[in-house]
């Protein structure tokens, strides 16, 4: 995964989201890539390209201790930045991310069980 980063950088030269993130993090580490809107309107926490790359790599390293490239990762996250970090962490680690909302306390677990049954062997993240 190597992208030639220079002033005439062309994103179409990147073949993966990770290559694109790495290029953007190298060119514009302080530029905001995500802003979380906790109430749907007011800007809350922001994340820069550099922060996203750093956090995702740290997560990928932890995944790498327990997984192999191509493993499936069931991602049980509510909406938010933690999901974004884990999703990119999966990509850095070569895992197949399978996002799903965590079940509510009063919710039937049938939907989640169906997802897990369809995946076979899987790791769960939350």
Predicted segments — roles?
Residues 5-13, 39-45:
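Acyl-group handling in specialized metabolite and lipid biosynthesis
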Residues 11-35, 54:
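A short N-terminal helical cap/helix-turn-helix that marks the beginning
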Residues 30-67, 71-88, 104-113:
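Conserved AMP-binding/adenylate-forming core of the ANL superfamily
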Residues 91:
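Anion (oxyanion) recognition and catalysis
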Residues 94:
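Structured binding elements
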Residues 99-126:
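Conserved ATP-dependent adenylate/AMP-binding module captured primarily in the ANL superfamily
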């Amino acid at each position: 995964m190597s992208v030639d980063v220079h002033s005439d950088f062309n994103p179409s030269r990147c073949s993966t989201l990770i290559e694109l993130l790495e290029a953007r993090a190298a060119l514009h580490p302080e530029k905001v890539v995500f802003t979380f809107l906790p109430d749907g309107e007011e800007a809350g926490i922001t994340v820069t390209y550099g922060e996203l790359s750093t956090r995702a790599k740290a997560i990928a390293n932890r995944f790498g201790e327990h997984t192999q490239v191509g493993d499936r990762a069931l991602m049980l996250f509510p909406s938010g930045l933690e999901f974004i970090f884990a999703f990119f962490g999966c990509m850095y680690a070569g895992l197949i991310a399978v996002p799903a909302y965590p079940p509510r306390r009063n919710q039937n677990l049938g939907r989640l069980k169906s997802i897990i049954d369809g995946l076979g062997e899987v790791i769960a993240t939350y």
